[in-house]
Amino acid sequence: GGNSSVKGKQNIIKLSSNENSHGPSPKVVEYAKKHGTLFNAHRYPNIDGIKLREKLSTINNLDPKNIVIGCGSDETLLFAALAFCQDGDEIIHAQHGFEMYPIISKIVGATSKLIKEDENYKVNVKSILNEVTPSTKIIYLANPNNPTGTYLTRKEIIDLLKALPKNIIVVLDGAYAEYVIKDDYDGGFSLVNEFDNVIITRTFSKVFGLAGLRVGWCYSSAKIAQILKKVKGPFNTQRISQEIAIIALEDKDYLNKVIENNHNIKNW
């Protein structure tokens, strides 16, 4: 994260973190200018991000009790490992994928197992299942995947969940979910109603352009949500971050503009 620098070079363009070049919504900028970053700085943030969870539940038609707020989706990914893994367990993830997955494995003392990919750098149900052992506790699947841009269809995800032992947690990392415009793609929220071992993660860092404020969240069954809350710190997201995230959610016109622009650029 942050700015990149190369000795002797100026104005380096940093691409490695996939930051939103549009920046945040104009409404977010206006709110920040009006209130300033020290708005209510003497007050602790809400422990559970109640207002943000309620806004997320309304927009996505979800149960707010099953939403857990994190310091970026990175933290919610870590929550899963802290809650369900220990030394000697195995975590499965793609060979070419988000670098947080092997970092998280090291944090909890687990072993990373890499999913074999095809010639297009895509994983499939069979290649995932081939890595499963009695020691497997979590499978992290960025869907769509970072950095390859490949994705698993709703049918593939369902086939995988049906074939897996029910004690294995499948974390569907939807950091780039809003960008996908495909009929066979599903962001995964509906899967929570069908399978008890699914966690869906989302972030405000990408399409919403709020990477510096570190806000993310996850959605799961009530049982899993209660377990995740046990490993979450009480004040893990800033007050201003929660409030600005709500403003960003309300600016649908800007969100659609960013998505449309990304879609058009892909056709170049």
What are these model-derived regions, one by one?
Residues 25, 197-268:
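PLP-dependent aminotransferase class I/II
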Residues 63, 108-109, 194-195:
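Short, structured coil segments at secondary-structure junctions
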Residues 83-141:
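PLP-dependent aminotransferase-like
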Residues 1-43:
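N-terminal "arm"/small-domain region of PLP-dependent enzymes with the aminotransferase-like
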Residues 50-90:
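Phosphate-binding glycine-rich loop
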Residues 123-134, 147-170, 174-207:
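Active-site pre-lysine segment of PLP-dependent enzymes
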Residues 15, 139, 173-175, 201, ...:
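Structural scaffold positions in well-ordered secondary structure
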Residues 18-21, 73-74, 98, 143-147, ...:
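Short glycine-rich anion-binding loops that position phosphate/pyrophosphate groups of nucleotides
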